[in-house]
Design a protein with these regions (language model features):
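A generic short alpha-helical patch detector that favors 3-5-residue windows
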Residues: 16-20, 42, 66, 78, ...
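Conserved beta-strand -> loop -> alpha-helix junction used to position metal-binding or nucleic-acid-contacting
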Residues: 41-48, 53-91
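A generic hydrophobic-helix recognition signal that picks specific residues
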Residues: 38, 62, 142-146
Length: 215
């Protein structure tokens, strides 16, 4: 999550043998029990069932499909010689200034490449409800929320640290290791700020229902 002062905060973590939407839904239930009443936006990769899980637990929340993961999915269906051009054109969609411009850019993208790569249309159709949620938020923070990069940076660091340790004797050992890794993030040490300019706070506050007076 992001605190009012703009720093990242780990709201929860859990150990599971596999990654599923049901696991994440359990974590959503956990943060609700600990007092979280509203969430404005969830961003996730292409894991099946995530949008439905979000809507069951936080019906008012928006769900954003990560555009980086979406681009990687597209790349898998593109021939190497075309990949640079195709992915370059795809950037015009999520870098558009307005949602309607993004929609037009995607239509043009599919018109240009759809016949050559017929599976592209299905990729976007499956996540169409989560493509442009980030446009509902101030422009100053959109680059921070149209991907899952914030949590991916943490995950990458955790993966790197865990490789140094050859094995964990039990689940408690792994749990302690993960917890110790997240402590600096929770304390705000060495964490990049994503704080929007003050003028955008009023816009963000109005997104809550009922609107909040203080952040």
């Amino acid at each position: 999550g992001i605190t009012p002062d703009g720093t990242r905060e780990v709201l929860d973590y859990a150990l599971y043998p596999t990654e599923t939407a049901a696991n994440y839904e359990e974590m959503m239930e956990s943060i609700k029990k600990r007092g979280v009443k509203q969430v404005l936006l969830f961003a996730s990769d292409g894991l099946a069932g995530m949008r439905d899980a979000v809507k069951r637990q936080f019906p008012e929340a928006e769900h954003q499909q990560c555009w980086v993961h979406l681009s990687r999915t597209v790349a898998r269906y593109i021939r190497n010689k075309d990949r640079k051009e195709v992915l370059g054109d795809l950037k015009s969609v999520y870098r558009a200034s307005y949602e309607d411009e993004a929609g037009k850019a995607l239509a043009e993208f599919l018109s240009k490449y759809g016949k050559r790569y017929p599976k592209l249309a299905g990729i976007f159709e499956r996540v169409k409800e989560s493509l442009y949620s980030f446009y509902k938020f101030p422009e100053a923070i959109r680059k921070s929320i149209y991907t899952t990069n914030m949590i991916e940076r943490s995950n990458k660091g955790l993966k790197h640290k865990s490789k140094v340790k050859e094995q964990f004797p039990n689940e408690d050992s792994l749990d302690r290791f993960v917890c110790c890794y997240f402590v600096p993030i929770l304390s705000g040490c060495n964490v990049a700020s994503v704080k929007p300019p003050p003028k955008y706070y009023n816009c963000l506050k109005k997104n809550f229902k009922p609107p909040i007076n203080k952040m």
